[in-house]
Amino acid sequence: MTENKLIYGSVSGKKVDENGEGLGGALIGLFKSDDVEFTEENALMTAVSGDDGSFVFENVPYGNWYIREIKPLTGFVLNETVYDVNISENEQVVEIEIVNKLVRGNIALTKVDAEYTDTKLTGAVFEVYKDSNDNGELDSEDELIGTLTEKEIGQYEMNDLLYGRYFVKESKAPEGFTLDEGVYE
């Protein structure tokens, strides 16, 4: 009598940022190769990446499977790439790397005359601070990261900011106007 044993392998992966640093806490799923909805409920198995970004799916049966991120870490964009893996040999280990990009954003504002709001004002300087201690208030622990650039008359912006909270404070008023003492989040 011949006994057939099922073939099982594993998928070993690493979750990293754009610089190759490991990211812990991301939810990864193993899905049937005919799945089209990549949710935690549809996953055959799930794993959470460790502090170093590593994750493992063990005892994955013979066949074709999909690996996909289900939930990224806060501040990172969901990687929607579907990784096709094939378990074809007993104790086979398939290795993959899932890269996440940081969420980036922009700050844009328009400086206008308080009395004549259709009149845009040029020549102001706005400092941008990162809320380094994440307390929601501009204080001495916050980092000055630069100033807004005036792109057009009265229109100021800063692009490609990493995920987080920022404050904008006018440091120089346009000629003939008083400084706005407000801090804007």
Could you describe each region identified by the protein language model?
Residues 1-185:
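Solvent-exposed loop/turn and edge beta-strand elements of beta-rich ligand-binding domains
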